[in-house]
Amino acid sequence: SVGFKAGVKEYKLTYYTPEYETKETDILAAFRVTPQPGVPPEEAGAAVAAESSTGTWTTVWTDGLTSLDRYKGRCYHIEPVPGEEDQYIAYVAYPLDLFEEGSVTNMFTSIVGNVFGFKALRALRLEDLRIPVAYTKXFQGPXHGIQVERDKLNKYGRPLLGCTIKPKLGLSAKNYGRAVYECLRGGLDFTKDDENVNSQPFMRWRDRFLFCAEAFYKAQAETGEIKGHYLNATAGTCEEMIKRAVFARELGVPIXMHDYLTGGFTANTSLAHYCRDNGLLLHIHRAMHAVIDRQKNHGMHFRVLAKALRLSGGDHIHAGTVVGKLEGERDTTLGFVDLLRDDFIEKDRSRGIYFTQDWVSLPGVLPVRSGGIHVWHMPALTEIFGDDSVLQFGGGTLGHPWGNAPGAVANRVALEACVKARNEGRDLAAEGNEIIREASKWSPELAAACEVWKEIRFNFKAVDTLDPS
C-alpha cells in the first residue's frame, strides 16, 4: 500500500517523544500549557510542538517529500505546575535548521506564531528559551555592550543616572532642551526622550535633536563629564528611523533610542547594526511589553523578550525596578537581569530560569530601572542591582520643589553616598535610610527631596509571580 494515509491523527503519536535526548544545537522552549477540558497534557504539549514547527491539523502527502524526523519540533518532557490545576510546563526542542540565521523575527514567527490561537489550549505562555551557542553566533547582539559603554563615557564603579523628560508630550523643542540642560548640569549622566516622543506637531524630531544636542554639549562643557540624551529614533518606517539615527550621529551625540516592541525586531536589528558601525550606543524602551508578558498563564515572559533583545541588539533596556510603581518581583527580576548582563547563567528555577544559557561572545546589556523611584529608593536600588545598571528618575528628578538641576543634584548625592557606604562595607539594606539622612545634612537639595517623597509607596503585589517549588 501507499505510505500516505489521509485523515487526522493525534499529535502525540508524532510529536510527543519523552525518550528524546536534546542536542546542543537545539533551541529549547519551556511553555506553560493550560489545555481545554478533556485534552490530555501529552496531546497539548505535542500540539504546541507540532503547530510551532512542521505540523498541521491533518496528514498531508507532502510530508513524504521531506524528513519529518529531522525538522519536527519535539515535546520531550511535561511536568505539572505546583499549586495550579490543569497547568503544565511542556518542554519543546526545535532543530536549528527551522530558523533563519540572525533573525529574531523568524524565530518568534515560528515559536510564538499561530500556536497561541490554538483551540485545544485554553491558554499558552512561553516561559523561557535556551538559545544554543550555534544560533547565538549568528547575531551581532548589542551595539557595543557594558564595557565599551563605560569606556566611551569614562564612568566606572557606580550605576549610571538618568531622567525621562516630563511632561512626556506637549513641550516645545526649546523648552525640552532647557529641561535636558538643567538635569545634565545638575549631575545626571543621561536624559531621555519618553517612549512616545517621536515627531509630533508640537515638537518635530529634528528640532528636538538640535536643542538636545546644544543642551548636552553645554552641560558637558560646564561639568567636565561626558553626558548624553537618548534621542528616540523610532519612526513609522525603517528608512525614516535610520535617517534620524544618521542625524544623531552627525550631531556627535553618544546615544540614540528605539522602542523595540512597537518598532519591531527587524527595525531594531537594523538600527543596532547601524549603531555598531557608527559608534552610537542604543537605549531600548520596552513599550507594549505588559500586553505580552503580564498575565501569568498566557503570552510570553519578559525574560524571553529580554533574551530576544540581547540577540537583536541594544545597550540598555528597561527591566523593572522591584521597588517602584511598575511590575517586577525581586527574584524573577534578578533572574532576567543576569540574563541581560552575564556571559553564562546556570539554570535556576527559584529565579524562573528554566535553562542554562551561554551567551559566548555576545556583549551584555545594561538593565534600566525606572518608574516611580526617588531618593529614598537609592540604597535598595544600589544594593539589589549593583554597579552595572542605569537608574532613571523622571518624576524623582523633575518633581523636586526647587527644579530640575537641584533634583539632579539630590539624586547624584544620594547615589554617591550609597556607593561610598557600600564600598566602606556598610549594609545598604539595613542602614539605607540612615545613609540618606546623613548625606542630606550637607546637601540641602537632597534634604528637600527627602522631605517631598518621604511618604511615597507603591505597595501592590506583583501579578506575575514565581510558582511555588
UniProtKB/Swiss-Prot annotation:
GO biological process: photorespiration; reductive pentose-phosphate cycle
UniProt cofactor(s): Mg(2+)
Site label Transition state stabilizer, positions: K325
Sites of N6,N6,N6-trimethyllysine modification: K5
Keyword Oxidoreductase: yes
GO cellular component, one term: chloroplast
Compartments (UniProt record): Plastid, Chloroplast
Keywords annotated in UniProt: Calvin cycle, Carbon dioxide fixation, Chloroplast, Disulfide bond, Lyase, Magnesium, Metal-binding, Methylation, Monooxygenase, Oxidoreductase, Photorespiration, Photosynthesis, Plastid
Top class in the EC scheme: lyase
Residue list for modification N6-carboxylysine: K192
Catalytic reaction list: 2 (2R)-3-phosphoglycerate + 2 H(+) = D-ribulose 1,5-bisphosphate + CO2 + H2O; D-ribulose 1,5-bisphosphate + O2 = 2-phosphoglycolate + (2R)-3-phosphoglycerate + 2 H(+)
Enzyme Commission code(s) on record: 4.1.1.39
Record: residues binding Mg(2+): K192, D194, E195
MF (Gene Ontology): magnesium ion binding; monooxygenase activity; ribulose-bisphosphate carboxylase activity
InterPro entries: RuBisCO, RuBisCo_large_chain_AS, RuBisCO_lsu_C, RuBisCO_lsu_C_sf, RuBisCO_lsu_fd_N, RuBisCO_lsu_N_sf, RuBisCO_lsuI
Residues at which substrate binds: N114, T164, K168, R286, H318, S370
SUPFAM superfamilies linked to this entry: RuBisCo, C-terminal domain (SSF51649), RuBisCO, large subunit, small (N-terminal) domain (SSF54966)
UniProt entry tagged with the keyword Oxidoreductase: yes
Function: RuBisCO catalyzes two reactions: the carboxylation of D-ribulose 1,5-bisphosphate, the primary event in carbon dioxide fixation, as well as the oxidative fragmentation of the pentose substrate in the photorespiration process. Both reactions occur simultaneously and in competition at the same active site.
Family: Belongs to the RuBisCO large chain family. Type I subfamily.
Record NCBIfam families: PRK04208.1 (NF003252)
General remark: The basic functional RuBisCO is composed of a large chain homodimer in a 'head-to-tail' conformation. In form I RuBisCO this homodimer is arranged in a barrel-like tetramer with the small subunits forming a tetrameric 'cap' on each end of the 'barrel'.
Subunit-level organization: Heterohexadecamer of 8 large chains and 8 small chains; disulfide-linked. The disulfide link is formed within the large subunit homodimers.
Designated name of the protein: Ribulose bisphosphate carboxylase large chain
Source organism per UniProt: Fleroya rubrostipulata (Mitragyna rubrostipulata)
